[in-house]
């Protein structure tokens, strides 16, 4: 008999280890020689506490304020709360710290904020600035320490040719240093074809979005282009010149997340990364698009597709899901929808019936790029799934991750058709180019048009009308690929070894479970109210 699989997430020995020391190292962003006696002043300046206080004073209607920190800055949350509470005594404003984000740290966690009925979210650290659904947002990137002399030294070693076309880029916090780095390279070292990117604060047209940080642009620098929606390119080129990123080498401060890095590698000639936390320059290897092309062919012959939702805050998430479902059904494939926070190998391994995953997440860090083949099933994006399910597989060489662009591509692919064309409705198998053989299970929903099932005569029957096909089990007119896979397993979960001859006609007792969130379940609130009334 097979051993039951492990259904829990693996954890290391230090996952919940108690921290014994009270010393916290902040040299990576406050500098190696910061004075601990001036810690509160440095923290206040780094996190823009004074501008934040001014913002809250201008909006007295905000009484519940949530503070969202990434994992590497959560150690400063208590200090920030202490500084803010000193500015608003008598408990006029309640401050809540989001100690753990459900999805990507660069995105605003609206779901967690709504648990405490937040009226505004203050997001600290690096941010993707993607449009969200409802809540007002205040961004505070911070100004981390940077040794410019060390950066310039590594830059000169990587680019000895003064005429090379180079674009300077960084994440949101470190982008404040780019204008000064540009002046050194352009003015002192005489690099002639240098441009740099800056956060496009003017692109944030949302009424309830505020950026506390300020970005200095020298007077002799012109805007020469726009990179994506949230970055502006500056330089001393003629505005009439057409700035094409394909002509430039990228010099990036800090290491981008894998999805972001993959996108940048498809746009620029080459990518050079200098991370202040790591020694030396990194020039690869980077995630490759060649593996993505293979995954597209896997999706083309997949019978069961899992839609993996790794965000609940980004705008157009629901619209993208609806278009994906429509596309998958049109191609006569089965789909299942999963909402998973921080997906990992162990979580997704529990759903072995899924042939391929299509992930919806933030383009900066919410998309899984399986660079080392850790996951059991491939993971692709909506754009790649749309290319795979087209009538003919075409490879553009692009990597589109924006939801709005993906929706437009899917709508263009569907072309207003709700059903698959008659030429593809035959029972002929489809050739799987990855495994080099024909498969007849790539379109399980096609079987519905050939089945005529009759329900049981007894309306009180507890048995579902089931028929097994080559593609899956049909239960009351619905193809279930997971049910078919379950029937073929030797171990089917807890209770699978129950003696079927001992049938209890009364069935099991149904009990109502608990409701609410961990901060306060329903029965906790009821008990608290009873104690107050006594």
Swiss-Prot record:
Which GO biological-process labels does this protein carry? Answer: protein histidyl modification to diphthamide
Q: Does the keyword Chaperone apply?
A: no
Going by the UniProt record, its keywords in alphabetical order are: Cytoplasm, Iron, Iron-sulfur, Metal-binding
Give the cofactor note text.
Answer: Binds 1 [4Fe-4S] cluster per subunit. The cluster facilitates the reduction of the catalytic iron-sulfur cluster in the DPH1 subunit.
Q: In which pathway does it act?
A: Protein modification; peptidyl-diphthamide biosynthesis
Q: Which Pfam families match?
A: Diphthamide_syn (PF01866)
Query: InterPro entries of this UniProt entry?
Result: DHP2 (IPR010014), DPH1/DPH2 (IPR016435), DPH1/DPH2_1 (IPR042263), DPH1/DPH2_3 (IPR042265)
Q: What is its main location?
A: cytoplasm
* Result for mutant: residue 128 to S: Normal sensitivity to diphtheria toxin
Gene Ontology cellular-component terms listed: 2-(3-amino-3-carboxypropyl)histidine synthase complex; cytoplasm
Which residues of the sequence carry a binding annotation for [4Fe-4S] cluster? Answer: 107, 128, 362
Q: What happens on changing residue 167 to A?
A: Normal sensitivity to diphtheria toxin
Describe what happens upon changing residue 239 to C: Abolishes diphthamide modification of elongation factor 2. Resistance to diphtheria toxin and sordarin. Sensitive to hygromycin B
Q: Which GO terms describe its molecular function?
A: 2-(3-amino-3-carboxypropyl)histidine synthase activity; 4 iron, 4 sulfur cluster binding; metal ion binding
Q: Report the family membership.
A: Belongs to the DPH1/DPH2 family. DPH2 subfamily.
Subunit architecture: Component of the 2-(3-amino-3-carboxypropyl)histidine synthase complex composed of DPH1, DPH2, KTI11/DPH3 and a NADH-dependent reductase, predominantly CBR1. Interacts with DPH1; the interaction is direct. Interacts with KTI11/DPH3.
Designated name of the protein: 2-(3-amino-3-carboxypropyl)histidine synthase subunit 2
